[in-house]
Structure formats: structure tokens, C-alpha cells
């Protein structure tokens, strides 16, 4: 029987682009784990994606995962856009590579290991875990320690895949 894990995640960016961070809470029964990291130069959307990715990648086995986020970009991307992007070789209707391709490739790979239900909550409306994740993400953004290599180097810019 698969374990039920509840995940709450949020991203933050000071400047957008600017320094950013994510805060992710994983909860299994009475156990809770907090994941966070701060990046020197990144975007809010990248931090929203990174929080979910790092949470899922930290799971050691396939699980049922309930993910609560406040990012429409991530929720719509996963539930509505990703299948089309994959079919079109990760290109937009204008034949350009999608933004944040490195992260969409990672999330696309890791979601296949789990049974996921996505929940969206409105930001800054008092949802306890979302507010905690927001605070953790902002704190990490204020003290970055990691380079967002793919963003800073425009890695997928002008590349033919």
C-alpha cells in the first residue's frame, strides 16, 4: 500500500528576477520535513517549480501525494499544458522553447513516480501551511547560497532539442 504524503510548497523572488527561494513542507502521518534553498538570481516561477520538484525528488518511494500550492503557473502547467508541450517537443506555438524547460523536464520525470492530486489555494489568505511555506521561501530568498545555473546562463536559449 502506498504512503499518503501531503506537500505544501511556495516560491518567492525579491525583484523577479532577483534572489529567490522556495519553502516546502512534507507531511507523512505525524512526521514533518521542511525543504528550502535560496538562489542568487532566479524568478518566482522557477522557485515555485523548484519547491515542488525538490519535494517530490526527496521521496524515497512511490507515494500518493497531495500537493497544495498557490501558483497557477505550476498547477496549470502540470494539469493542462505539459502534455501538449511534450508532444510539441517543448516548444510554444511560436516555435520557441518554453520558459524554464530544465525544470519542466525534471518535474515531468518525477511526477511519473507518484500518484498526485493537485490543490490550489489563493496566496496570502490565511492558509496555515501556505503562509508557513511563504515565510520559509522569503527567508531563503533573503540569504541565497546557490546559483541557478540554468537561469543565469540561459542554458536552453537558442538550443535545438
Curated annotation (Swiss-Prot):
GO terms for biological process: DNA replication, removal of RNA primer. Mg(2+) 1 binds at residues 10, 48, 70. GO terms for molecular function: magnesium ion binding; nucleic acid binding; RNA-DNA hybrid ribonuclease activity. Its EC number is 3.1.26.4. It catalyses: Endonucleolytic cleavage to 5'-phosphomonoester. It holds the Pfam family RNase_H. Keywords: Cytoplasm, Endonuclease, Hydrolase, Magnesium, Metal-binding, Nuclease. Residues 1-142 form the RNase H type-1 domain. Binds 1 Mg(2+) ion per subunit. May bind a second metal ion at a regulatory site, or after substrate binding. NCBIfam families: PRK00203.1 (NF001236). This is Ribonuclease H. The gene is rnhA.
Amino acid at each position: 500500500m502506498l504512503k499518503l504524503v501531503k506537500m505544501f510548497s511556495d516560491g518567492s523572488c525579491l525583484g523577479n528576477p532577483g534572489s529567490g527561494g522556495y519553502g516546502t513542507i512534507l507531511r507523512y502521518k505525524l512526521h514533518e520535513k521542511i525543504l528550502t534553498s535560496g538562489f542568487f538570481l532566479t524568478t518566482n516561477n522557477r522557485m515555485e517549480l523548484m519547491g515542488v520538484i525538490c519535494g517530490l525528488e526527496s521521496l524515497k518511494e512511490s507515494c500518493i501525494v497531495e500537493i497544495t500550492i498557490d501558483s497557477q503557473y505550476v498547477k496549470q502547467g502540470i494539469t493542462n499544458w505539459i502534455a501538449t508541450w511534450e508532444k510539441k517537443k517543448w516548444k510554444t506555438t511560436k516555435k520557441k522553447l518554453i520558459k524554464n524547460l530544465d525544470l519542466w523536464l525534471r518535474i515531468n520525470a518525477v511526477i511519473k513516480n507518484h500518484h498526485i492530486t493537485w490543490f490550489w489555494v489563493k496566496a496570502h489568505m490565511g492558509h496555515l501551511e501556505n503562509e508557513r511555506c511563504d515565510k520559509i521561501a522569503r527567508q531563503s530568498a533573503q540569504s541565497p547560497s546557490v546559483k541557478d545555473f540554468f537561469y543565469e546562463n540561459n542554458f536552453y536559449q537558442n538550443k535545438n532539442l
